[in-house]
Protein backbone atom coordinates (compact mmCIF):
# COMPACT_ATOMS: atom_id res chain seq x y z
CA UNK A 1 0.00 0.00 0.00
CA UNK A 2 2.92 2.32 0.64
CA UNK A 3 3.68 2.69 -3.04
CA UNK A 4 0.12 3.40 -4.09
CA UNK A 5 -0.55 6.77 -5.60
CA UNK A 6 -2.61 9.36 -3.80
CA UNK A 7 -6.32 9.03 -4.26
CA UNK A 8 -8.42 11.98 -5.39
CA UNK A 9 -9.20 14.47 -2.67
CA UNK A 10 -5.64 14.81 -1.39
CA UNK A 11 -4.06 18.25 -1.63
CA UNK A 12 -2.12 18.47 -4.90
CA UNK A 13 -2.92 14.88 -5.77
CA UNK A 14 -1.50 13.34 -8.92
CA UNK A 15 -4.77 14.10 -10.71
CA UNK A 16 -4.60 17.76 -9.69
CA UNK A 17 -0.94 17.94 -10.65
CA UNK A 18 -1.86 16.68 -14.11
CA UNK A 19 -4.65 19.27 -14.36
CA UNK A 20 -2.05 21.93 -13.65
CA UNK A 21 0.35 20.36 -16.17
CA UNK A 22 2.81 19.89 -13.30
CA UNK A 23 4.92 16.78 -13.09
CA UNK A 24 7.28 16.17 -10.17
CA UNK A 25 10.94 16.11 -11.13
CA UNK A 26 12.43 12.61 -11.40
CA UNK A 27 14.56 11.62 -8.45
CA UNK A 28 17.58 11.31 -10.70
CA UNK A 29 17.44 15.06 -11.34
CA UNK A 30 17.66 16.02 -7.67
CA UNK A 31 20.71 17.13 -5.81
CA UNK A 32 22.14 14.64 -3.36
CA UNK A 33 20.55 15.22 0.03
CA UNK A 34 23.26 13.36 1.90
CA UNK A 35 25.71 16.23 1.50
CA UNK A 36 24.68 18.88 4.00
CA UNK A 37 26.25 22.09 5.14
CA UNK A 38 28.92 21.56 7.83
CA UNK A 39 27.03 24.01 10.01
CA UNK A 40 24.01 21.72 10.24
CA UNK A 41 23.94 19.99 13.62
CA UNK A 42 23.05 16.36 14.24
CA UNK A 43 19.44 17.09 15.22
CA UNK A 44 18.86 18.99 12.01
CA UNK A 45 20.48 16.15 10.13
CA UNK A 46 17.82 13.80 11.49
CA UNK A 47 15.10 16.28 10.63
CA UNK A 48 16.50 16.57 7.13
CA UNK A 49 16.38 12.81 6.79
CA UNK A 50 12.68 12.94 7.67
CA UNK A 51 12.08 15.69 5.13
CA UNK A 52 14.06 13.78 2.52
CA UNK A 53 11.78 10.80 3.06
CA UNK A 54 8.66 12.97 2.84
CA UNK A 55 10.00 14.65 -0.28
CA UNK A 56 10.48 11.25 -1.92
CA UNK A 57 6.86 10.43 -1.01
CA UNK A 58 5.88 13.66 -2.72
CA UNK A 59 7.93 12.78 -5.80
CA UNK A 60 6.19 9.42 -6.08
CA UNK A 61 2.81 10.87 -5.01
CA UNK A 62 2.39 8.21 -2.38
CA UNK A 63 -0.85 7.87 -0.52
CA UNK A 64 0.76 8.45 2.88
CA UNK A 65 2.26 11.84 1.91
CA UNK A 66 -0.32 13.90 3.78
CA UNK A 67 -0.11 11.72 6.91
CA UNK A 68 3.68 11.94 6.97
CA UNK A 69 3.66 15.73 6.59
CA UNK A 70 1.17 16.10 9.44
CA UNK A 71 3.12 13.65 11.58
CA UNK A 72 6.34 15.60 11.11
CA UNK A 73 4.58 18.91 11.76
CA UNK A 74 2.89 17.64 14.92
CA UNK A 75 6.25 16.45 16.21
CA UNK A 76 7.59 20.00 15.81
CA UNK A 77 4.52 22.18 16.28
CA UNK A 78 5.27 22.83 19.93
CA UNK A 79 7.71 25.31 18.48
CA UNK A 80 6.51 26.78 15.17
CA UNK A 81 9.71 28.72 14.79
CA UNK A 82 11.68 25.50 14.95
CA UNK A 83 9.50 23.74 12.35
CA UNK A 84 9.67 26.56 9.81
CA UNK A 85 13.36 27.19 10.40
CA UNK A 86 14.03 23.52 9.70
CA UNK A 87 11.94 23.72 6.54
CA UNK A 88 13.67 26.92 5.37
CA UNK A 89 17.10 25.51 6.18
CA UNK A 90 16.27 22.33 4.27
CA UNK A 91 15.34 24.32 1.15
CA UNK A 92 18.26 26.74 1.24
CA UNK A 93 20.85 24.07 2.11
CA UNK A 94 19.94 21.98 -0.91
CA UNK A 95 19.73 25.15 -3.03
CA UNK A 96 17.43 23.42 -5.50
CA UNK A 97 14.40 25.70 -5.52
CA UNK A 98 12.69 24.45 -8.64
CA UNK A 99 12.61 20.87 -7.35
CA UNK A 100 11.20 21.97 -3.99
CA UNK A 101 8.74 24.60 -5.13
CA UNK A 102 5.71 22.32 -5.48
CA UNK A 103 6.72 20.50 -2.32
CA UNK A 104 6.49 23.73 -0.31
CA UNK A 105 3.08 24.60 -1.78
CA UNK A 106 1.80 21.11 -0.93
CA UNK A 107 2.93 21.52 2.69
CA UNK A 108 1.29 24.95 2.81
CA UNK A 109 -2.04 23.58 1.53
CA UNK A 110 -2.02 20.57 3.83
CA UNK A 111 -1.27 22.67 6.93
CA UNK A 112 -3.84 25.28 5.95
CA UNK A 113 -6.47 22.61 5.50
CA UNK A 114 -5.78 21.07 8.92
CA UNK A 115 -4.42 23.91 11.08
CA UNK A 116 -5.62 27.19 9.60
CA UNK A 117 -6.74 28.44 13.02
CA UNK A 118 -3.54 27.37 14.78
CA UNK A 119 -0.61 27.88 12.44
CA UNK A 120 0.88 31.38 11.91
CA UNK A 121 1.11 31.28 8.13
CA UNK A 122 3.32 34.36 8.10
CA UNK A 123 6.19 31.89 8.45
CA UNK A 124 5.54 30.74 4.90
CA UNK A 125 6.02 34.25 3.48
CA UNK A 126 9.79 34.10 3.71
CA UNK A 127 9.96 30.56 2.33
CA UNK A 128 7.71 31.40 -0.63
CA UNK A 129 9.79 34.51 -1.26
CA UNK A 130 12.95 32.39 -1.35
CA UNK A 131 11.61 29.72 -3.73
CA UNK A 132 9.59 31.92 -6.09
CA UNK A 133 10.02 35.71 -5.82
CA UNK A 134 13.65 36.23 -4.83
CA UNK A 135 15.50 37.85 -7.73
CA UNK A 136 18.48 35.45 -7.46
CA UNK A 137 16.42 32.75 -9.18
CA UNK A 138 17.45 31.69 -12.64
CA UNK A 139 15.09 32.20 -15.61
CA UNK A 140 13.99 28.55 -15.60
CA UNK A 141 13.17 28.50 -11.87
CA UNK A 142 11.37 31.84 -12.05
CA UNK A 143 9.31 30.82 -15.09
CA UNK A 144 8.42 27.57 -13.37
CA UNK A 145 7.04 29.36 -10.30
CA UNK A 146 5.21 31.96 -12.45
CA UNK A 147 3.61 29.20 -14.51
CA UNK A 148 2.62 27.31 -11.38
CA UNK A 149 0.94 30.29 -9.74
CA UNK A 150 -0.84 31.25 -12.97
CA UNK A 151 -2.44 27.83 -13.21
CA UNK A 152 -2.88 27.36 -9.47
CA UNK A 153 -4.82 30.59 -8.98
CA UNK A 154 -6.92 29.96 -12.05
CA UNK A 155 -7.92 26.57 -10.63
CA UNK A 156 -8.29 27.77 -7.04
CA UNK A 157 -9.54 31.31 -7.62
CA UNK A 158 -11.89 31.21 -4.64
CA UNK A 159 -9.17 29.93 -2.30
CA UNK A 160 -7.16 33.08 -1.89
CA UNK A 161 -5.22 32.35 1.31
CA UNK A 162 -2.00 31.64 -0.59
CA UNK A 163 -2.55 34.71 -2.76
CA UNK A 164 -2.95 36.88 0.35
CA UNK A 165 0.21 35.37 1.82
CA UNK A 166 2.17 36.26 -1.31
CA UNK A 167 1.05 39.89 -1.17
CA UNK A 168 0.85 40.38 2.59
CA UNK A 169 4.24 42.12 2.88
CA UNK A 170 3.02 44.95 0.63
CA UNK A 171 0.57 45.95 3.34
CA UNK A 172 3.30 46.55 5.91
CA UNK A 173 3.88 50.24 6.43
CA UNK A 174 7.34 51.64 5.60
CA UNK A 175 8.61 48.42 4.05
CA UNK A 176 11.56 48.75 1.66
CA UNK A 177 10.90 49.46 -2.01
CA UNK A 178 13.03 46.46 -3.03
CA UNK A 179 10.66 43.97 -1.40
CA UNK A 180 7.54 45.78 -2.61
CA UNK A 181 8.76 46.04 -6.20
CA UNK A 182 9.93 42.41 -6.30
CA UNK A 183 6.49 41.21 -5.20
CA UNK A 184 4.56 43.52 -7.54
CA UNK A 185 6.77 42.61 -10.50
CA UNK A 186 6.31 38.92 -9.72
CA UNK A 187 2.52 39.38 -9.61
CA UNK A 188 2.68 41.34 -12.87
CA UNK A 189 4.51 38.45 -14.54
CA UNK A 190 1.86 36.02 -13.28
CA UNK A 191 -0.95 38.24 -14.61
CA UNK A 192 0.76 38.69 -17.97
CA UNK A 193 1.30 34.97 -18.46
CA UNK A 194 -2.23 34.20 -17.24
CA UNK A 195 -3.70 36.52 -19.88
CA UNK A 196 -1.59 34.88 -22.59
CA UNK A 197 -2.81 31.45 -21.47
CA UNK A 198 -6.44 32.58 -21.19
CA UNK A 199 -6.53 32.09 -17.40
CA UNK A 200 -8.71 34.84 -15.96
CA UNK A 201 -9.65 33.85 -12.39
CA UNK A 202 -6.51 35.44 -10.99
CA UNK A 203 -7.47 38.76 -12.58
CA UNK A 204 -10.64 38.93 -10.49
CA UNK A 205 -8.64 37.80 -7.45
CA UNK A 206 -6.16 40.63 -8.05
CA UNK A 207 -8.93 43.19 -8.58
CA UNK A 208 -10.64 42.23 -5.32
CA UNK A 209 -7.34 42.38 -3.43
CA UNK A 210 -6.43 45.82 -4.83
CA UNK A 211 -9.83 47.31 -3.97
CA UNK A 212 -9.60 45.81 -0.47
CA UNK A 213 -6.05 47.15 -0.17
CA UNK A 214 -7.28 50.66 -1.05
CA UNK A 215 -9.65 50.56 1.92
CA UNK A 216 -7.20 48.89 4.33
CA UNK A 217 -3.70 49.57 3.00
CA UNK A 218 -1.56 48.84 6.05
CA UNK A 219 -1.03 45.98 8.47
CA UNK A 220 0.34 46.34 11.96
CA UNK A 221 3.87 45.01 12.06
CA UNK A 222 4.43 42.27 14.61
CA UNK A 223 7.69 40.96 16.00
CA UNK A 224 7.34 37.94 13.72
CA UNK A 225 6.76 40.06 10.60
CA UNK A 226 9.65 42.32 11.53
CA UNK A 227 11.91 39.27 11.78
CA UNK A 228 10.70 38.01 8.38
CA UNK A 229 11.33 41.41 6.77
CA UNK A 230 14.86 41.52 8.18
CA UNK A 231 15.51 38.00 6.87
CA UNK A 232 14.27 38.94 3.39
CA UNK A 233 16.36 42.11 3.41
CA UNK A 234 19.38 39.97 4.26
CA UNK A 235 18.53 37.68 1.34
CA UNK A 236 18.43 40.70 -1.00
CA UNK A 237 21.70 42.00 0.44
CA UNK A 238 23.41 38.65 -0.05
CA UNK A 239 22.23 38.54 -3.66
CA UNK A 240 23.68 41.98 -4.33
CA UNK A 241 26.93 41.18 -2.53
CA UNK A 242 27.41 38.14 -4.75
CA UNK A 243 27.44 40.33 -7.85
CA UNK A 244 30.92 41.66 -8.50
CA UNK A 245 31.23 45.06 -10.08
CA UNK A 246 33.24 45.58 -13.22
CA UNK A 247 35.70 47.74 -11.29
CA UNK A 248 36.38 45.00 -8.74
CA UNK A 249 36.89 42.38 -11.45
CA UNK A 250 39.34 44.58 -13.30
CA UNK A 251 41.38 45.23 -10.15
CA UNK A 252 41.44 41.55 -9.21
CA UNK A 253 42.57 40.68 -12.72
CA UNK A 254 45.38 43.18 -12.52
CA UNK A 255 46.45 41.88 -9.13
CA UNK A 256 46.68 38.32 -10.42
CA UNK A 257 48.34 39.01 -13.77
CA UNK A 258 50.82 41.73 -12.91
CA UNK A 259 53.72 41.79 -10.51
CA UNK A 260 53.54 45.23 -9.02
CA UNK A 261 55.02 47.08 -6.16
CA UNK A 262 53.68 46.59 -2.67
CA UNK A 263 52.44 50.16 -2.50
CA UNK A 264 50.35 49.80 -5.67
CA UNK A 265 48.80 46.58 -4.41
CA UNK A 266 47.89 48.31 -1.17
CA UNK A 267 46.34 51.16 -3.18
CA UNK A 268 44.23 48.75 -5.20
CA UNK A 269 43.11 46.95 -2.07
CA UNK A 270 42.05 50.28 -0.64
CA UNK A 271 40.07 51.00 -3.82
CA UNK A 272 38.33 47.63 -3.61
CA UNK A 273 37.57 48.19 0.06
CA UNK A 274 36.16 51.64 -0.67
CA UNK A 275 34.01 50.22 -3.48
CA UNK A 276 32.76 47.43 -1.20
CA UNK A 277 31.76 50.05 1.35
CA UNK A 278 29.99 52.03 -1.37
CA UNK A 279 28.10 48.93 -2.50
CA UNK A 280 27.03 48.14 1.05
CA UNK A 281 25.85 51.73 1.52
CA UNK A 282 23.91 51.62 -1.77
CA UNK A 283 22.25 48.35 -0.80
CA UNK A 284 21.39 49.65 2.65
CA UNK A 285 20.03 52.88 1.17
CA UNK A 286 17.90 50.94 -1.33
CA UNK A 287 16.49 48.62 1.32
CA UNK A 288 15.75 51.53 3.62
CA UNK A 289 14.12 53.48 0.80
CA UNK A 290 10.43 53.80 1.47
CA UNK A 291 7.75 54.35 -1.12
CA UNK A 292 4.17 55.42 -0.78
CA UNK A 293 2.43 52.19 -1.68
CA UNK A 294 -1.18 52.92 -2.60
CA UNK A 295 -3.67 51.65 -5.14
CA UNK A 296 -2.14 53.84 -7.86
CA UNK A 297 1.43 52.71 -7.16
CA UNK A 298 0.46 49.05 -7.39
CA UNK A 299 -1.92 49.42 -10.34
CA UNK A 300 0.46 51.57 -12.40
CA UNK A 301 3.32 49.09 -11.95
CA UNK A 302 1.08 46.18 -12.94
CA UNK A 303 -0.28 48.17 -15.88
CA UNK A 304 3.21 49.01 -17.12
CA UNK A 305 4.18 45.32 -17.09
CA UNK A 306 1.06 44.36 -19.08
CA UNK A 307 1.52 47.21 -21.56
CA UNK A 308 5.15 46.27 -22.07
CA UNK A 309 4.41 42.57 -22.55
CA UNK A 310 1.24 42.84 -24.63
CA UNK A 311 1.52 46.14 -26.54
CA UNK A 312 5.23 46.98 -26.80
CA UNK A 313 7.39 43.85 -26.89
CA UNK A 314 4.77 41.73 -28.63
CA UNK A 315 1.86 42.30 -30.95
CA UNK A 316 -1.41 42.68 -29.08
CA UNK A 317 -3.01 39.26 -28.66
CA UNK A 318 -6.68 38.40 -28.95
CA UNK A 319 -6.73 37.58 -25.24
CA UNK A 320 -5.54 41.07 -24.33
CA UNK A 321 -7.74 42.83 -26.88
CA UNK A 322 -10.80 40.95 -25.59
CA UNK A 323 -9.90 41.23 -21.91
CA UNK A 324 -13.08 43.10 -20.82
CA UNK A 325 -15.20 40.20 -22.08
CA UNK A 326 -13.34 37.79 -19.81
CA UNK A 327 -12.48 40.02 -16.85
CA UNK A 328 -14.72 43.07 -16.74
CA UNK A 329 -13.78 44.38 -13.29
CA UNK A 330 -10.03 44.10 -13.81
CA UNK A 331 -10.33 45.73 -17.26
CA UNK A 332 -12.33 48.56 -15.72
CA UNK A 333 -9.55 49.15 -13.19
CA UNK A 334 -6.86 49.11 -15.90
CA UNK A 335 -8.90 51.48 -18.08
CA UNK A 336 -9.22 53.94 -15.20
CA UNK A 337 -5.47 53.82 -14.57
CA UNK A 338 -4.61 54.18 -18.28
CA UNK A 339 -6.78 57.27 -18.47
CA UNK A 340 -5.73 58.92 -15.22
CA UNK A 341 -2.03 58.11 -15.58
CA UNK A 342 -1.38 58.47 -19.30
CA UNK A 343 -4.25 59.93 -21.30
CA UNK A 344 -6.14 62.58 -19.34
CA UNK A 345 -5.00 66.05 -20.48
CA UNK A 346 -5.93 67.58 -17.12
CA UNK A 347 -5.73 64.95 -14.39
CA UNK A 348 -2.90 62.63 -15.36
CA UNK A 349 -0.29 62.25 -12.68
CA UNK A 350 2.70 62.70 -15.01
CA UNK A 351 4.55 60.47 -12.55
CA UNK A 352 6.04 58.59 -15.47
CA UNK A 353 8.30 61.61 -16.03
CA UNK A 354 9.94 61.27 -12.62
CA UNK A 355 9.54 57.58 -11.89
CA UNK A 356 12.33 55.37 -10.61
CA UNK A 357 13.08 53.98 -14.07
CA UNK A 358 13.53 57.51 -15.50
CA UNK A 359 12.02 56.41 -18.76
CA UNK A 360 12.25 58.68 -21.76
CA UNK A 361 9.21 60.93 -21.94
CA UNK A 362 9.21 60.55 -25.73
CA UNK A 363 8.75 56.81 -25.28
CA UNK A 364 5.60 57.49 -23.28
CA UNK A 365 4.25 60.16 -25.61
CA UNK A 366 5.03 58.47 -28.92
CA UNK A 367 4.72 54.77 -28.04
CA UNK A 368 2.70 54.08 -24.89
CA UNK A 369 -0.01 56.72 -25.34
CA UNK A 370 -0.82 55.92 -29.00
CA UNK A 371 -0.91 52.18 -28.32
CA UNK A 372 -3.12 52.46 -25.25
CA UNK A 373 -5.42 54.82 -27.16
CA UNK A 374 -5.59 52.27 -29.95
CA UNK A 375 -6.38 49.52 -27.43
CA UNK A 376 -9.26 51.51 -25.91
CA UNK A 377 -10.75 52.94 -29.11
CA UNK A 378 -10.40 49.86 -31.33
CA UNK A 379 -11.08 47.11 -28.81
CA UNK A 380 -11.94 47.60 -25.15
CA UNK A 381 -14.46 50.46 -25.34
CA UNK A 382 -15.74 49.58 -28.80
CA UNK A 383 -16.41 45.95 -27.90
CA UNK A 384 -17.48 46.58 -24.29
CA UNK A 385 -18.99 50.10 -24.03
CA UNK A 386 -20.44 49.09 -20.66
CA UNK A 387 -17.04 50.07 -19.24
CA UNK A 388 -18.09 53.69 -19.73
CA UNK A 389 -21.18 53.27 -17.61
CA UNK A 390 -19.83 51.16 -14.77
CA UNK A 391 -20.74 52.93 -11.54
CA UNK A 392 -18.97 50.94 -8.86
CA UNK A 393 -19.02 53.07 -5.73
CA UNK A 394 -16.29 51.05 -4.00
CA UNK A 395 -13.95 51.26 -7.00
CA UNK A 396 -14.73 54.94 -7.54
CA UNK A 397 -13.91 55.74 -3.92
CA UNK A 398 -10.71 53.70 -4.11
CA UNK A 399 -9.57 55.59 -7.23
CA UNK A 400 -10.31 59.05 -5.82
CA UNK A 401 -13.60 59.17 -7.73
CA UNK A 402 -12.14 58.87 -11.21
CA UNK A 403 -15.17 58.72 -13.50
CA UNK A 404 -14.53 56.99 -16.81
CA UNK A 405 -17.37 58.69 -18.66
CA UNK A 406 -16.22 62.18 -17.68
CA UNK A 407 -12.60 61.38 -18.45
CA UNK A 408 -13.38 59.86 -21.86
CA UNK A 409 -15.47 62.89 -22.83
CA UNK A 410 -12.62 65.19 -21.79
CA UNK A 411 -10.10 63.14 -23.76
CA UNK A 412 -12.30 62.89 -26.85
CA UNK A 413 -12.70 66.68 -26.89
CA UNK A 414 -9.24 67.90 -25.90
CA UNK A 415 -6.72 65.06 -26.02
CA UNK A 416 -3.15 66.41 -26.18
CA UNK A 417 -4.15 69.71 -27.78
CA UNK A 418 -4.33 71.39 -24.39
CA UNK A 419 -0.76 70.57 -23.47
CA UNK A 420 0.49 71.25 -26.98
CA UNK A 421 -0.96 74.73 -27.32
CA UNK A 422 -0.48 75.83 -23.74
CA UNK A 423 3.14 74.71 -23.82
CA UNK A 424 3.72 76.61 -27.03
CA UNK A 425 2.18 79.77 -25.62
CA UNK A 426 4.17 79.51 -22.40
CA UNK A 427 7.38 78.91 -24.31
CA UNK A 428 6.79 81.90 -26.56
CA UNK A 429 5.90 84.21 -23.68
CA UNK A 430 8.68 83.10 -21.35
CA UNK A 431 11.60 82.87 -23.73
CA UNK A 432 11.47 84.60 -27.09
CA UNK A 433 15.15 83.82 -27.67
CA UNK A 434 14.67 80.06 -27.83
CA UNK A 435 13.16 79.94 -31.31
CA UNK A 436 14.99 76.74 -32.23
CA UNK A 437 13.76 74.98 -29.10
CA UNK A 438 10.23 76.20 -29.72
CA UNK A 439 10.35 74.95 -33.28
CA UNK A 440 11.47 71.54 -32.06
CA UNK A 441 8.67 71.49 -29.49
CA UNK A 442 6.16 72.48 -32.14
CA UNK A 443 7.37 69.75 -34.48
CA UNK A 444 7.28 67.11 -31.74
CA UNK A 445 3.82 68.19 -30.60
CA UNK A 446 2.59 68.24 -34.18
CA UNK A 447 3.89 64.71 -34.75
CA UNK A 448 2.28 63.57 -31.53
CA UNK A 449 -1.09 65.04 -32.50
CA UNK A 450 -0.94 63.42 -35.92
CA UNK A 451 -0.13 60.12 -34.25
CA UNK A 452 -3.03 60.15 -31.78
CA UNK A 453 -5.66 62.07 -33.76
CA UNK A 454 -7.07 58.99 -35.59
CA UNK A 455 -7.57 57.23 -32.27
CA UNK A 456 -9.19 60.30 -30.73
CA UNK A 457 -11.63 60.41 -33.64
CA UNK A 458 -12.45 56.73 -33.07
CA UNK A 459 -12.80 57.34 -29.34
CA UNK A 460 -15.22 60.18 -29.99
CA UNK A 461 -17.23 57.93 -32.31
CA UNK A 462 -17.31 55.13 -29.73
CA UNK A 463 -18.47 57.57 -27.04
CA UNK A 464 -21.30 59.05 -29.11
CA UNK A 465 -22.45 55.63 -30.30
CA UNK A 466 -22.44 54.23 -26.75
CA UNK A 467 -24.58 57.08 -25.41
CA UNK A 468 -26.92 56.83 -28.40
CA UNK A 469 -27.36 53.07 -27.97
CA UNK A 470 -28.44 53.63 -24.37
CA UNK A 471 -31.24 55.90 -25.62
CA UNK A 472 -32.34 53.16 -28.04
CA UNK A 473 -32.61 50.55 -25.29
CA UNK A 474 -36.10 49.54 -24.26
CA UNK A 475 -37.68 51.61 -21.55
CA UNK A 476 -37.02 49.39 -18.54
CA UNK A 477 -35.73 49.87 -15.00
CA UNK A 478 -32.19 48.79 -15.84
CA UNK A 479 -31.65 51.15 -18.79
CA UNK A 480 -33.39 53.97 -16.93
CA UNK A 481 -31.04 53.44 -13.98
CA UNK A 482 -28.05 53.75 -16.32
CA UNK A 483 -29.48 56.93 -17.82
CA UNK A 484 -30.12 58.33 -14.35
CA UNK A 485 -26.53 57.62 -13.33
CA UNK A 486 -25.30 59.28 -16.52
CA UNK A 487 -27.41 62.36 -15.88
CA UNK A 488 -26.12 62.62 -12.31
CA UNK A 489 -22.54 62.34 -13.57
CA UNK A 490 -22.77 64.70 -16.53
CA UNK A 491 -24.45 67.60 -14.78
CA UNK A 492 -24.62 71.13 -16.26
CA UNK A 493 -21.59 72.24 -14.24
CA UNK A 494 -19.45 69.62 -15.99
CA UNK A 495 -20.37 70.92 -19.45
CA UNK A 496 -20.08 74.56 -18.36
CA UNK A 497 -16.50 73.93 -17.23
CA UNK A 498 -15.65 72.42 -20.61
CA UNK A 499 -17.25 75.32 -22.48
CA UNK A 500 -15.34 77.80 -20.32
CA UNK A 501 -12.05 76.10 -21.16
CA UNK A 502 -12.87 76.16 -24.87
CA UNK A 503 -13.73 79.86 -24.67
CA UNK A 504 -10.41 80.60 -22.99
CA UNK A 505 -8.36 79.14 -25.83
CA UNK A 506 -6.51 81.77 -27.85
CA UNK A 507 -6.35 79.65 -30.98
CA UNK A 508 -8.78 78.10 -33.42
CA UNK A 509 -11.19 76.12 -31.26
CA UNK A 510 -13.85 75.17 -33.82
CA UNK A 511 -12.95 71.48 -33.64
CA UNK A 512 -13.60 71.50 -29.89
CA UNK A 513 -16.89 73.36 -30.41
CA UNK A 514 -18.07 70.70 -32.87
CA UNK A 515 -17.19 67.89 -30.48
CA UNK A 516 -18.84 69.33 -27.40
CA UNK A 517 -21.92 70.28 -29.43
CA UNK A 518 -22.37 66.74 -30.77
CA UNK A 519 -21.86 65.16 -27.35
CA UNK A 520 -24.36 67.49 -25.67
CA UNK A 521 -26.93 66.83 -28.39
CA UNK A 522 -26.74 63.03 -28.10
CA UNK A 523 -26.54 63.18 -24.30
CA UNK A 524 -29.59 65.45 -24.02
CA UNK A 525 -31.74 63.22 -26.22
CA UNK A 526 -30.71 60.18 -24.17
CA UNK A 527 -31.53 61.77 -20.82
CA UNK A 528 -34.79 63.24 -22.09
CA UNK A 529 -36.42 59.90 -21.27
CA UNK A 530 -36.14 60.48 -17.52
CA UNK A 531 -36.46 64.29 -17.63
CA UNK A 532 -37.94 66.12 -20.66
CA UNK A 533 -36.27 69.36 -19.54
CA UNK A 534 -32.79 67.94 -20.15
CA UNK A 535 -32.99 68.55 -23.89
CA UNK A 536 -33.62 72.29 -23.71
CA UNK A 537 -31.51 72.87 -20.59
CA UNK A 538 -28.34 71.36 -22.00
CA UNK A 539 -28.77 72.54 -25.58
CA UNK A 540 -29.06 76.08 -24.23
CA UNK A 541 -25.56 75.70 -22.79
CA UNK A 542 -24.17 75.87 -26.32
CA UNK A 543 -25.14 79.54 -26.46
CA UNK A 544 -22.33 80.22 -24.00
CA UNK A 545 -19.72 79.29 -26.61
CA UNK A 546 -17.95 82.42 -27.86
CA UNK A 547 -17.44 80.77 -31.26
CA UNK A 548 -20.24 79.05 -33.15
CA UNK A 549 -19.86 76.54 -35.95
CA UNK A 550 -22.29 75.17 -38.49
CA UNK A 551 -22.86 72.11 -36.29
CA UNK A 552 -23.52 74.09 -33.09
CA UNK A 553 -25.83 76.52 -34.90
CA UNK A 554 -27.80 73.66 -36.45
CA UNK A 555 -28.25 72.00 -33.05
CA UNK A 556 -29.35 75.28 -31.44
CA UNK A 557 -31.93 75.89 -34.18
CA UNK A 558 -33.52 72.45 -33.97
Swiss-Prot record:
Residues 424-444 have a biased composition (Low complexity). Residues 245-266 have a biased composition (Basic and acidic residues). Keywords: Coiled coil. Residues 239-266, 424-447 are annotated as: Disordered. Residues 47-78 form a coiled coil. It comes from the Eukaryota. This is Putative uncharacterized protein DDB_G0287623. It comes from Dictyostelium discoideum. The lineage of its organism: Eukaryota, Amoebozoa, Evosea, Eumycetozoa, Dictyostelia.
Amino acid sequence: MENEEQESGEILSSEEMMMLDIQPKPLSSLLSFSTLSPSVDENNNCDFDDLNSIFKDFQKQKKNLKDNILKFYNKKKENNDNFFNILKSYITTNNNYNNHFYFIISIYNILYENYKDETPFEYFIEIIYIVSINDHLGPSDRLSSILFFSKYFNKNGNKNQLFNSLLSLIKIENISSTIVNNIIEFLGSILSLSISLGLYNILQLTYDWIIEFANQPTTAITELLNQIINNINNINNNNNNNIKTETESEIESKSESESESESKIETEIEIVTEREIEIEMEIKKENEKQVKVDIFYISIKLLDILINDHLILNESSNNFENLPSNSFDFSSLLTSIIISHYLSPFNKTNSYINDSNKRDNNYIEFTVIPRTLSLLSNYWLRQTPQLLFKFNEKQSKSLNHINLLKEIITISIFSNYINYNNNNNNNNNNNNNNNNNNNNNNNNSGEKNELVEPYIMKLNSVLIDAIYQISECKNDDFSNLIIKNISNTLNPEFFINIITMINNFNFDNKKFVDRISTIIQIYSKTCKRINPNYLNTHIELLKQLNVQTQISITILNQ
